Design a protein with these regions (language model features):
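Glycine-rich, highly charged phosphate/nucleotide-binding loops
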Residues: 1-9
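A short, GP-enriched loop/loop-strand-helix hinge that lies immediately N-terminal to
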Residues: 13-56, 71-74
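Active-site nucleotide/adenylate-binding loops and adjacent lid/helix of ATP-dependent enzymes
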Residues: 54-140, 162-163, 197-200
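Glycine-rich phosphate/pyrophosphate-binding beta-alpha loops
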Residues: 175-187, 234-248
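Conserved metal-phosphate-binding beta-hairpin within the catalytic cores
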Residues: 207-242
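Peripheral (often C-terminal) accessory segments that flank ATP-dependent C-N-forming ligase machineries
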Residues: 257-346
């Protein structure tokens, strides 16, 4: 069905240059798996199926981190067979998250969250029992909690060309994360930053594995060891990757210049000052605890170096504007309701 739908669309638009871009893990796998069937009709950059499977599944990604000298949190796992008896190799709190994001997306149970934090054994037992009481039956990743607020996170977006070389890297420092159950781990505001040492290490990793296309990494700075620890790699753009385009580095340009125009891309590190937001600035002002980062956000706002994800002036009809205002007001409500709640509570 995937291939037929796309080839039918291509037939209806013959004579046009068609570019494919995956926006989910599942579509990246399908694109990689059906590359030969789609290449006659579409232009795209895509990793191999083997690379996707080895790096998208968290347990395999951590093995790749070990091989390439990249740090990650102390990690264990459990299965539906042993989750009641598993012993953690670290102290609570414990992060609990699925190893198979696609399977978890399709499961349902009360108070489901994208990621859980268990602060003691009782909470651990309740959370794992709830997850395995659903249709999700794959392993769970159990991970030590890295201390620090949301602003200790980093998000890295990269584009690797058809030549398997990295051509664009953009690093962001989240100021605040989403707080809703389904939004935990998604970013609500990102400050564009630069860290050459970190980028050099990640560039070497991507080129060593022969990656092609977009990649997105989440990591957190661990002040105890003075290093970044990787959480995951997504084989696509991230939900908040527009922060790169908003800072002046249009992600689509790198893709089109590569797969359509076949231009030499060189190597670019995005380093323009910019603040990207999906949350209202008032929410950031209230919940961002670091005074220096808040001052930086206020400065960028005053200088007009701010982009609002949901605000597009070219699409600002009266109906859209009313929706935008309602959405922002609702953001205050849902942040207050869910702030700090990563347990099995509603």
């Amino acid at each position: 069905m995937f291939v037929k739908t796309l080839t039918d669309f291509a037939a209806e638009h013959s004579g046009k240059t068609l570019v494919l871009l995956s926006c989910s893990d599942g579509y990246t796998i399908l694109l990689a798996r059906n590359r030969a069937a789609l290449e006659p009709y579409y232009k795209f950059a895509c990793p191999t199926e083997e690379n996707v499977m080895n790096l998208d599944m968290k347990e395999y990604f951590y093995k790749a981190c070990e091989k390439h000298g990249l740090s990650y949190p102390k990690t264990s796992s459990c299965t539906v067979q042993n989750y009641r008896e598993v012993q953690l190799p670290f102290e609570f709190p414990c992060i609990i998250k699925p190893s198979n994001s696609m399977a978890y997306w399709n499961c349902h149970f009360p108070h489901k969250k994208k990621v859980f934090v268990a602060y003691n054994q009782q909470e651990f037992n309740e959370i794992t029992a709830a997850i395995y009481g659903s249709s999700y039956q794959d392993p769970l990743i159990l991970q030590e909690y890295i201390p620090g607020d949301d602003n200790c996170m980093r998000v890295l977006n990269c584009y690797s060309g058809l030549d398997h070389k990295v051509h664009l890297m953009a690093l962001g420092r989240p100021l605040l994360e989403e707080q809703t159950p389904e939004g935990i781990g998604n970013y609500a505001a990102i400050l564009s930053v630069r860290d050459d040492a970190l980028m050099a290490k990640m560039k070497a990793f991507l080129e060593d594995v022969g990656w092609e296309g977009f990649s997105n990494f989440d990591m957190k700075f661990d002040a105890r060891t003075n290093e970044y620890k990787l959480f995951e790699m997504n084989p696509r753009q991230g939900r908040s990757s527009f922060f790169v385009t908003a800072s002046g580095y249009n992600l689509a340009k790198w893709l089109v210049d590569d797969v359509v125009e076949h231009k030499p891309l060189g190597f670019t590190i995005a380093d323009a000052e910019s603040l990207w937001m999906i949350a209202p600035f008032g929410v950031i002002r209230k919940y961002l605890k670091d005074p220096d980062l808040l001052a930086e956000a206020i400065r960028l706002k005053k200088q007009g170096k701010v982009s609002h994800q949901l605000l597009c002036r070219e699409d600002l009809s009266v109906k859209r504007l009313l929706w935008y205002i309602k959405s922002h007001l609702n953001y205050y409500r849902k942040t207050a309701k869910y702030y700090g709640n990563k347990s099995l509570r509603g």
